[in-house]
Amino acid sequence: MTGARNWLNKPLIFFKFNNHHTASPGDKMVKYVAFFEELGKDDVGIAGGKGANLGELTQAGIPVPPGFVVTAATYDKFMTDTGLQPVVMEMLENLDVNDTKELQRVSAEIKDIITSTEVPEDIQTLIIESYNALCQRIGKDDVYVAIRSSATAEDLPEASFAGQQDTFLNIRGAEDVLDYVRRCWASLFEARAIFYREENNFDHSKVYIAVVVQEMVDAEKAGVMFTVHPSTGEDRILIEGSWGLGEAVVSGSVTPDTYWVDKGTGKLLEFTVGEKNIMFTREDGRTVKKEVPPELRNKRVLSDGEIAALAEMGRRIQDHYGSPQDTEWAIMDGDVYMLQSRPITTLGEATEETEVKSREILVKGLGASPGLASGRVKIIREIHELDKIQIGDILVTVMTTPDMVPAMKRASGIITDEGGVTCHAAIVSRELGIPCVVGTGNATEVLKENQVVSIDGNRGLVYEGSVIEGEKKEAEAETVTVESPLLTVTEVKVNVSMPEAARKAAATGADGVGLLRTEHMMLTTGVHPRKFIEEGREDELVNTLAENILKVADEFYPRPVWYRTLDAPTDEFKTLEGGENEPYEHNPMLGWRGIRRELDEPEILRAEFRAIKKLHEQGYTNIGIMIPLVQHPDELRKAKMIAEEAGLKPHRDVEFGIMVETPAAALIIEDFIEEGIDFVRLEP
């Protein structure tokens, strides 16, 4: 193997392992590491979009911080040599990516498998020697680097999505570099990336990931630059910038300064100074998010000279590639660096303006993706709220993240408080072809849940009601206007006995499940729950319960599902395997059942609570617990103690309620309230 330590004498390094390896990306001579100087725009197959374009920029004489690429062949070798490839592909088989919770679960499991698998020694040597060679070139020990994913399909002209895989900043030392390269490999299976590949019919087994390891630029100011208007294709340069590292702009954490530049003359045509409240900087080897000093928040970031230098560099890059480019830049000590460049794949034309007649303007922002759309406002403040976005809704949030892409696909338009026209929300909206308004400042506060609004992605305006007239309005109505169910003050819930009936029950439009019975789930196993416990099969019982409860919780999510703990009459469980010792009772309906029985057999109740905890950890926090046939607050108190032993804190982690089925319980309801309950079901 040619050693990376010889790199100064041989500027182009090719690594070749002697052991057998089939390189799916398919070069005659497999490159496992390539420094930027040896890469060009045609090397997307081995270096991914980022890596190939950094090589192309370097060869074109554009100032780029030095670095190297751990190629897609190395990832392929890692997955093959460790035996992970067939395991991961099997986990992805038959996955429904529109099932958000299942997608998140599978993604987390795959990433955990990859990051916990030791990197083979030959690959470790390759990466560590390459990092040491980079440090030698720069003339420093343990150089700080940025480690960025570079998927082989991420930045191709026909497919572009922001932020599918991970980026790690301020990584230092060979061991940490090795660890974060592996994390980048794992990020190929982020939920958002899996979803994107499925939606675009990319074969998971044929998508690879390269990893860029690049000297870290400790930027004083940074941002993005489009060499044409990203929405309309207008031939002028757009620059966005903010203080510190570029993460603040790219992530949409701030509303950056916006500068429009004449491409021919380099003259600044217009600019808007954004309110830049936060910044990312490097402190003690860590990327730190901090507040921008008050005197800089509303101060212009770029000088005329810096704008001219960036515009000139943008023209050079576009001329070199022969097509409009989306670039990232940074300025350190007065020097301008390009961090990456990729083709703009979302160019469109401004849509025909529709006349707006006497409509109230609710909020104003920046038009980030052209078009007009009307729909009902759905405000997203937490990631677990995404499932409330239905087809045709208007998604309103502070700023979108890559995890929101499946919900964004269902929306007819996007509105954000923060961000500029090159933030995540803007890029994804243009890719999806839906209108987007960003940087409104207060949309999440001004707009109301379920309010009907219209957004103008050309002008950056949001109007009250529907403003789409004529044919456009009719066409929009087919996808946006939904016949709302009758609204009542009292919620109407359904009973569900069999998980298989959940879909039909959910389709009724009920406000939730007021009673999810456990007994049918137990009976279908054919085994008495006590037998599971006695034979040490508690985990099997937990998983069986969780699988059945999940079918209901998923259909109704985020509507509440009240799970009633086991209320097993003795006569029904006699026929189960292990039920031979069930006592004989003259009237089982008034006998040993409900919470009385479960406190006598606490292991079964604990297994039920463990199943619910497992589902809560997967995001199904809509499941509440309901205790049946309570007679006294002491029973409720003991049930809560068992729940806490199982890892569920009543009232904090999970809603905890009771069924009132006897006059005695009804007469002392205030005692139950004092003990603490979140809801009551009255059983006549």
Swiss-Prot record:
Q: Which domain of life is it from?
A: Archaea
Keywords, sorted A to Z: ATP-binding, Kinase, Magnesium, Metal-binding, Nucleotide-binding, Transferase
Binding locations of substrate: R517, R564, E661
Enzyme Commission code: 2.7.9.2
PROSITE patterns linked? PEP_ENZYMES_PHOS_SITE
List the cysteine pairs that form cystine: none
Pathway as given in its UniProt record: Carbohydrate biosynthesis; gluconeogenesis
Q: Which cofactor does it need?
A: Mg(2+)
Q: Does the keyword Metal-binding apply?
A: yes
- The entry marks the following residues as binding Mg(2+), namely E661
- A GO biological process this protein is involved in? gluconeogenesis
User: Does the record carry Transferase as a key word?
Assistant: yes
A GO molecular function assigned to this protein is: pyruvate, water dikinase activity
State the active site.
Answer: H424 (tele-phosphohistidine intermediate)
Q: Which InterPro entries match?
A: ATP_grasp_subdomain_1, PEP-util_enz_mobile_dom, PEP_synth, PEP_util_AS, PEP_util_C, Phosphohistidine_dom_sf, PPDK_AMP/ATP-bd, Pyrv/PenolPyrv_kinase-like_dom
Q: Which top EC class applies here?
A: transferase
Q: Do you know which Pfam families this protein is assigned to?
A: PEP-utilizers, PEP-utilizers_C, PPDK_N
* Catalysed reaction equations from the record: pyruvate + ATP + H2O = phosphoenolpyruvate + AMP + phosphate + 2 H(+)
The remark listed among the other comments is: The reaction takes place in three steps, mediated by a phosphocarrier histidine residue located on the surface of the central domain. The two first partial reactions are catalyzed at an active site located on the N-terminal domain, and the third partial reaction is catalyzed at an active site located on the C-terminal domain. For catalytic turnover, the central domain swivels from the concave surface of the N-terminal domain to that of the C-terminal domain.
Domain remark from Swiss-Prot or TrEMBL: The N-terminal domain contains the ATP/Pi binding site, the central domain the pyrophosphate/phosphate carrier histidine, and the C-terminal domain the pyruvate binding site.
**What role does this protein play?**
Catalyzes the phosphorylation of pyruvate to phosphoenolpyruvate.
What family does this chain come from, according to its entry? Belongs to the PEP-utilizing enzyme family.
Q: Which NCBIfam families match?
A: PEP_synth, PRK06464.1
Q: What is this protein called?
A: Probable phosphoenolpyruvate synthase
The species this protein belongs to is Methanothermobacter thermautotrophicus (strain ATCC 29096 / DSM 1053 / JCM 10044 / NBRC 100330 / Delta H)
- Organismal lineage: Archaea, Methanobacteriati, Methanobacteriota, Methanomada group, Methanobacteria
